[in-house]
Curated annotation (Swiss-Prot):
Residues 23-437 are lumenal. This is Dolichyl-diphosphooligosaccharide--protein glycosyltransferase subunit 1. There is a cross-link at residue 536 (Glycyl lysine isopeptide (Lys-Gly) (interchain with G-Cter in SUMO2)). The chain crosses the membrane at residues 438-455. Component of the oligosaccharyltransferase (OST) complex. OST exists in two different complex forms which contain common core subunits RPN1, RPN2, OST48, OST4, DAD1 and TMEM258, either STT3A or STT3B as catalytic subunits, and form-specific accessory subunits. STT3A complex assembly occurs through the formation of 3 subcomplexes. Subcomplex 1 contains RPN1 and TMEM258, subcomplex 2 contains the STT3A-specific subunits STT3A, DC2/OSTC, and KCP2 as well as the core subunit OST4, and subcomplex 3 contains RPN2, DAD1, and OST48. Residues 1-22 form the signal peptide. The keyword DNA damage does not apply.
Amino acid sequence: MEAPIVLLLLLWLALAPTPGSASSEAPPLVNEDVKRTVDLSSHLAKVTAEVVLAHPGGGSTARASSFVLALEPELESRLAHLGVQVKGEDEEDNNLEVRETKMKGKSGRFFTVKLPVALDPGSKISIVVETVYTHVLHPYPTQITQSEKQFVVFEGNHYFYSPYPTKTQTMRVRLASRNVESHTKLGNPSRSEDILDYGPFKDIPAYSQDTFKVHYENNSPFLTITSMTRVIEVSHWGNIAVEENVDLKHTGAVLKGPFSRYDYQRQPDSGISSIRSFKTILPAAAQDVYYRDEIGNVSTSHLLILDDSVEMEIRPRFGLFGGWKTHYIVGYNLPSYEYLYNLGDQYALKMRFVDHVFDEQVIDSLTVKIILPEGAKNIQVDSPYDISRAPDELHYTYLDTFGRPVIVAYKKNLVEQHIQDIVVHYTFNKVLMLQEPLLVVAAFYILFFTVIIYVRLDFSITKDPAAEARMKVACITEQVLTLVNKRLGLYRHFDETVNRYKQSRDISTLNSGKKSLETEHKAVTSEIAVLQSRLKTEGSDLCDRVSEMQKLDAQVKELVLKSAVEAERLVAGKLKKDTYIENEKLSSGKRQELVTKIDHILDAL
């Protein structure tokens, strides 16, 4: 009985394909030519590889419908984006399908890329592999003073890490500056300005690794969004409200030693690696834009409306140095007809999962909450890439009864390539739109009924005149603070006009700036004088402090105008440059002292 079983087993093993046969293995492929470009000019590492992939055949007649892409073990954990395209074709809808896979006994991450057309033996295809890595440029030294420049270290691979052999390869490294402390010398690389060229390297075996290291100056903004919550609230009454809560951190070299605001404002190269401001691109239809932090509205931001977008310059209250953090909120409204589509009771919301915050952005952790109208059902989400979903929540706001459904999604390690649309499908019964108007009618009915009863009752209310007086004084003081800050801003703007005049020597620019300063300064000073009179009427002792501040401001204005006169004399050749610089230094010191006194008075107010 056992003999026939043994014979059948031996026959099955003889007929089964061996592990090395063509039926059990994918066709062998070869990287005929690889051109790598490693862009290290920002705080991201962008690696682009142009690969000529060949199917040499080698006795195999099988067609290759896909190939395997590998990432180095040292960089795999910091991968933010991976895209593969066929070279020479339009970018739209040209991304090849990529799925992560595993290779037994090999380290690193591996992906299977599906080819648009299967490769026959002897044929080739040119592809472009784009990868973006975050937090792989490490500051060295890790701490610098305000006046020092920032240097970083990057470690990678000289070779194109691949499961296939490579016949020839070159690598070009683009740095942020020409100031290079050191770099590896494999193959005697050439250097031109901020470019390092390695190779060509010949006949590179599969899975080859050789450490590439470069230590160079990089003062680009190392700005990272450590946490961001994006809330999208949809209303069927024509509006979509968007609000973004952003936690920012400068992840470059940590500031060592004291910080001098005077040097920071006076010297352009002071804190060269710090972040003074950045630009956020909002949708073209954005309206009612606001920007605030824990203190309140930040008035130093600027909004520029363009044809295809709204550009917002965000300037934090203080410059960001290495290790420093800040938090702010940006919100705006959008018309729903541009993003919300419907067919009967079927609705589709198409919006960006994450939008532009700043150039070369890095988001460590993103939470997106999409608040749908009350009564939305059968919710489905189509995302352009993998996202993590949390259980749906309920959100209650005005006139809600059983709550609005909230979609909660998460993703980590995002870059600009993740700025893509997400589509949310749901059903909504339009009859439910009558719910809120009926609730409003009922609320007004109850209100009027309550008022009718209230006016027929007699209540005696005792007022507190002292409390009302304090509230009036506080309101007037707040207006004075706003106007004083506005007046100081006029001086800063005029300083910029004087600097432009010294460069262009256009006297009309200076005269126009003087006229604008006089007009606006007179208007603001008059408003402060009116508020000072109101404080005096209220019997507040703050009136004297405002009067003192007015006197100090007159001295500041005198110094500002004197500085403009000195600039005219300098441009006209009536004043030597050394004398001008010395006078300007003395004037700046006096002016800074006066501004400090004004700040102390403002703090007292």
